[in-house]
């Protein structure tokens, strides 16, 4: 019973629509009605700007981290990665936003921040490296997921490998329309890293 409640709590934590809340508070808009219509961090950056977008990223990371910490906080024998996965599912299919959420890159990163802080830090570095090279947030997210999967193989932690592979597969699937736009050369590139406005 307690285990079920923990997973429900982790899911509800992941379901908190950070992008929607910050969009309403910072700009008075529903970001689902702007840009790509997605509740995630990329659309938050695109529609709200760097400052508000950064808050959304931080909040989404925090959701994953807190969810992964729940077993320790509540003294329940559940692996932190599994609690984290519940939050990731909540982020992608949030009960508080009609089950239409983000692509879970930041929330997945938050889970790993709790479980493997060094892996999280290398992920952030690799993401920004890919972003600097490609200027595509979507492609950088996918490539970072693939990097994380390869990294996890060297840890000999089978559950970590399984969870990272699962999350990466979800991230790639959730970016399928972005992949098509990259192929068609219609995917927007970021401008703020190059100093353009």
Curated annotation (Swiss-Prot):
Spell out the subcellular localization from the entry.
Answer: Cell membrane
Which membrane topology describes this protein? Multi-pass membrane protein
Q: What InterPro entries does the database record attribute to this sequence? A: G3P_acylTferase_PlsY
Q: What is this protein called?
A: Glycerol-3-phosphate acyltransferase
Which E.C. number(s) belong to this protein?
A: 2.3.1.275
- Subunit note: Probably interacts with PlsX.
The UniProt entry, under PANTHER family, shows: GLYCEROL-3-PHOSPHATE ACYLTRANSFERASE-RELATED, INNER MEMBRANE PROTEIN YGIH
Which family does the UniProt entry place this protein in?
Belongs to the PlsY family.
Q: Which NCBIfam families match?
A: glycerol-3-phosphate 1-O-acyltransferase PlsY
- The domain of life is Bacteria
Under Pfam families, the record lists: G3P_acyltransf (PF02660)
Q: In which pathway does it act?
A: Lipid metabolism; phospholipid metabolism
- Please report the organism this UniProt entry assigns to the protein: Bacillus licheniformis (strain ATCC 14580 / DSM 13 / JCM 2505 / CCUG 7422 / NBRC 12200 / NCIMB 9375 / NCTC 10341 / NRRL NRS-1264 / Gibson 46)
- GO CC term, one of those recorded: plasma membrane
Q: What does this protein do?
A: Catalyzes the transfer of an acyl group from acyl-phosphate (acyl-PO(4)) to glycerol-3-phosphate (G3P) to form lysophosphatidic acid (LPA). This enzyme utilizes acyl-phosphate as fatty acyl donor, but not acyl-CoA or acyl-ACP.
Q: Which GO terms describe its molecular function?
A: acyl-phosphate glycerol-3-phosphate acyltransferase activity
* The entry's keywords: Cell membrane, Lipid biosynthesis, Lipid metabolism, Membrane, Phospholipid biosynthesis, Phospholipid metabolism, Transferase, Transmembrane, Transmembrane helix
Family annotation (HAMAP family): PlsY
Q: Which reaction does it catalyse?
A: an acyl phosphate + sn-glycerol 3-phosphate = a 1-acyl-sn-glycero-3-phosphate + phosphate
Report the enzyme's class at the first EC level: transferase
Q: Report the transmembrane regions from the record.
A: 2-22, 69-89, 111-131, 153-173
Task: Please give the biological process terms from Gene Ontology that the record holds.
Answer: phospholipid biosynthetic process
């Amino acid at each position: 019973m307690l285990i079920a409640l923990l997973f429900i709590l982790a899911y509800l934590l992941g379901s908190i629509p950070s992008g929607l809340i910050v969009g309403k508070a910072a700009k008075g808009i529903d970001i689902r009605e702007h840009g790509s219509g997605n509740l995630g961090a990329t659309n938050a950056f695109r529609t709200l700007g760097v400052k508000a977008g950064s808050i959304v990223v931080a909040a989404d990371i925090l959701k994953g981290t807190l969810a992964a910490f729940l077993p320790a906080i509540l003294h329940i024998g559940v692996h932190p990665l599994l609690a984290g996965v519940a939050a990731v599912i909540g982020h992608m299919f949030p009960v508080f936003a009609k089950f239409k959420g983000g692509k879970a890159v930041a929330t997945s990163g938050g889970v790993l921040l709790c479980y493997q802080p060094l892996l999280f830090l290398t992920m952030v570095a690799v993401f920004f490296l890919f972003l600097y090279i490609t200027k595509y947030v979507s492609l950088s997210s996918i490539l970072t997921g693939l990097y994380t999967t390869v990294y996890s193989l060297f840890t000999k932690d089978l559950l970590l490998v399984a969870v990272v592979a699962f999350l990466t597969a979800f991230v790639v699937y959730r970016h399928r329309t972005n992949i098509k736009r990259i192929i068609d050369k219609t995917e927007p590139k970021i401008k703020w890293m190059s100093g353009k406005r």
